[in-house]
Design a protein with these regions (language model features):
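Charge-rich, well-structured scaffold segments of protease-associated domains
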Residues: 1-65, 88-94, 99-110, 116-300
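Polysaccharide-binding surfaces and accessory modules of carbohydrate-active proteins
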Residues: 62-77
Length: 300
């Protein structure tokens, strides 16, 4: 959903809740201020303090994002969408695993390295299997590492899957991962993936954003989750840790086994087509609005 929220839930939103939420969350005590460039930080801080912070009372609210409660065995979830006319049997099947925290730079680089090795190009083992199977039309757009939240998520799957092929897709992915671990990964692939990761992490241009903004956004997760943002900028130390660990036998294979294969916090997700999905949803919303409207007073 976009920032407007879920229309069905907006019906239940009260004015008091909205005001309280705004008071609690939209407060400078929750803000992180960045400066970049050849500027005098003291002058910027004085300006912010005079024009912003002095206009507010300090807030005692502690805003923090808790880690997801871990599940002890994989969970299967099915949701629905309204398909295009030619996609009535177009199922999306995705397996996703919850990993470590995104604001830990070594954990983040490890996870990126594993994802790159498995999925970066057509020669990568998991991508090769997914691209060459007849079980689906193409890779799911959810495939890869999601690093925009507090905890990392690794996902792999297909779109264009027949209704009766979900279990086959799950078996295909899990068997591929097990084969990668048992057969081993070539040092050439590992070093190539590491080299590409270093280039990408150190890249100054190419993202379409100013370099200063890139740095700020890379530091933001650590700021939001009460960690040291300077650790994120110290790429050399983090890569040195990774390179040192790569000297151990089967380091990447062990990571794949630990983070993915033996990780019970897995969701087997299926997005299934339903040509009546939109009409059903609109009916539910209309019924809620009608019920709500009947109970409204003039003061409401």
């Amino acid at each position: 959903h976009n920032s407007g929220g879920n229309p069905e839930n907006i019906i239940d939103l009260t004015h008091d809740y909205l005001v309280d939420f705004h008071r609690k969350h939209y407060h400078p005590s929750n803000a992180t201020f960045f400066t970049f460039g050849n500027l005098n930080p003291a002058e910027i801080q004085e300006f912010i303090n005079k024009n912003v912070l002095e206009n507010f009372e300090p807030s005692n609210e502690i805003i923090s994002v808790k880690n997801e409660d871990r599940i002890s065995k994989p969970k299967t979830v099915t949701e629905f969408y309204n398909p295009m006319p030619e996609d009535e049997n177009n199922h999306h099947v995705v397996l996703s695993w919850l990993l470590g925290e995104s604001h830990n730079p070594v954990e983040l680089l490890e996870s990126y390295l594993v994802s790159n090795i498995l999925l970066d190009n057509s020669a990568s083992p998991l991508r090769k299997v997914l691209e060459n199977t007849d079980l689906g039309k193409s890779l799911s757009p959810l495939t890869g590492l999601e690093a925009d939240h507090k905890e990392l998520v690794f996902a792999a799957g297909l779109e264009g899957v027949d209704a009766n092929a979900q279990l086959k897709v799950e078996e295909l992915i899990l068997n591929c991962l097990k084969n990668v671990v048992s057969n081993g990964i070539s040092n050439e692939l590992i070093q190539s993936s590491l080299h590409q990761l270093e280039i990408k992490q150190r890249e100054i241009t190419g993202s379409g954003m100013p370099y200063g903004l890139q740095i700020m956004l890379s530091c933001l997760p650590a700021c939001l989750h009460n960690d040291d943002p300077l650790k994120v900028l110290d790429l050399d130390s983090s890569f040195d840790v990774i390179k040192d660990r790569l000297n151990k036998d089967n380091y990447i294979e062990n990571l794949i086994e630990e983070k993915i294969i033996n990780n019970p916090h897995r969701v087997n997700y299926c997005l299934a087509p339903d040509i009546e999905f939109n009409s059903k949803n609109e009916k539910i919303i209309k019924e809620k609005i009608d019920k709500k409207s009947k109970n409204l007073s003039l003061e409401d």
